[in-house]
């Protein structure tokens, strides 16, 4: 049996969460956009890259919302153009990401795999603003109370890529989910389960 955390979180954040067994796990990160195998560091099994110009346009729209911050994800590092200092500490120490600060989003030094709106007042408030503008370009999902994530992958496509990389049939996969970003994964897995504490 192979255990694989599937999350909107970054690879390094997941490794910290699962520290006692981190080297034994496979990882589906950034809502399916980045896949890592076991060991330390794990082998990169796949990544799904966003078109840069459109991703940066989305990042600018998020920055234009006064109560939101934009977090741009590469494979191993998240990038932030912070409006407030406390968001840096939150992402670095509470979320546990490897984090770099950018002067502007155009300074993003690597491929973009995910763009996230961090909205402490609630992602459901900004989803109706951003979602319809980008739904024909990127997948988007509410990923926890404060996060609205955009990328070209989702946990379902990530699971399919992971199954191919590991030579596992989707019907042999058991998946557990509790939020909207889990729906594509639950649809792709042979044995899906919704947690009791799932979002309504």
Question: Where are the language model's segments positioned?
Answer:
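Generic anion/oxyanion-binding catalytic loop in active/binding sites
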Residues: 3, 44-47, 148, 175, ...
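Short, polar loop motifs at secondary-structure junctions
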Residues: 32, 196-200
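Active-site phosphate-binding/coordination module
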Residues: 1-87
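Short, well-ordered beta-strand core segments
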Residues: 27, 192-194
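Short, structured coil segments at secondary-structure junctions
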Residues: 20-23, 31, 133-136, 188-189
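Conserved acidic, metal-coordinating active-site core of Asp-based
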Residues: 61, 67-176, 180-188, 197
């Amino acid at each position: 049996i192979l255990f694989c955390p599937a999350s909107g979180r970054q690879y390094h954040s997941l490794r910290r969460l699962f520290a006692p067994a981190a080297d034994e796990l496979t990882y589906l990160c950034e809502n399916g956009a980045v896949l890592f195998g076991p060991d330390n560091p794990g082998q990169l099994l796949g990544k799904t890259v966003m078109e840069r110009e459109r991703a940066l346009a989305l990042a600018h729209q998020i920055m234009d919302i006064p109560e939101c911050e934009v977090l741009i994800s590469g494979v191993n590092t998240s990038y932030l153009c912070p409006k407030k200092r406390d968001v840096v500490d939150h992402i670095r120490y509470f979320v546990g990401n490897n984090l770099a600060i950018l002067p502007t989003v155009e300074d993003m030094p690597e491929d973009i795999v995910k763009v996230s709106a961090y909205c402490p007042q609630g992602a459901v408030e900004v989803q109706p603003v951003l979602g319809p503008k980008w739904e024909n370009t990127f997948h988007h999902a509410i990923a926890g109370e404060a996060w609205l994530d955009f990328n070209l992958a989702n946990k379902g496509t990530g699971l399919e890529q992971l199954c191919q990389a590991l030579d596992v049939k989707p019907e042999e996969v058991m998946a557990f989910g509790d939020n909207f970003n889990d729906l594509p994964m639950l649809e792709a897995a042979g044995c899906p389960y919704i947690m009791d504490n799932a979002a309504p």
